A protein has these predicted regions:
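AAA+ P-loop NTPase catalytic core and its hallmark functional loops
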Residues: 1-142
Length: 142
């Protein structure tokens, strides 16, 4: 996928997955893209995350209902347009990939949404080049 294709896809609201070997500049390109667009970049280094880093920590609210305390990155992307960068997606455990899929597809956690102009870019290494990596769930890979 060319840089122009990534640019067009991201601007059109489609999530983008950059799949390439380590060290080719996927992360650097994403930060430069965010800078060019004048958008803050919120990064989740998924290889070091657990599910609560993606969805937030559970708690019991004032109505005795289970809820989630949303992570800072999510609250930041609710307030203003920004770019969510899911780095090292192929090194994320399946338990982290699952909540990441919902965030990518719905730009939401529970019933709260991110800013409607939020862009999502993910970076992954091919399975044969991802040290300690996992196969991507088909919905994420597509």
């Amino acid at each position: 996928m060319s840089r122009d294709s990534i640019y067009i896809a991201a601007q059109s609201g489609w999530p983008v997955l950059m799949m390439a070997g380590p060290g080719v500049g996927k992360s650097m390109w994403t930060y430069a893209f965010g800078d060019t667009m004048g958008m803050p970049v919120e990064t989740l280094l998924l290889s070091t995350c657990d599910p609560s880093d993606v969805t937030g920590l559970p708690f019991i609210n004032k109505d005795d209902q289970k809820s989630l305390a949303k992570p800072t990155w999510f609250r930041n992307l609710q307030e203003k347009r920004g770019l969510l960068f899911l780095d090292e997606l192929s090194c994320a455990a399946p338990a982290v990939q699952a909540p990441a899929l919902r965030v990518v597809n719905e730009l939401a956690i529970e019933d709260e949404k991110m800013h409607p102009d939020t862009m999502v870019i993910a970076a992954a290494n091919p399975a044969d080049k991802a040290a300690g990596g996992w196969d991507l769930a088909p919905p994420l890979a597509n």
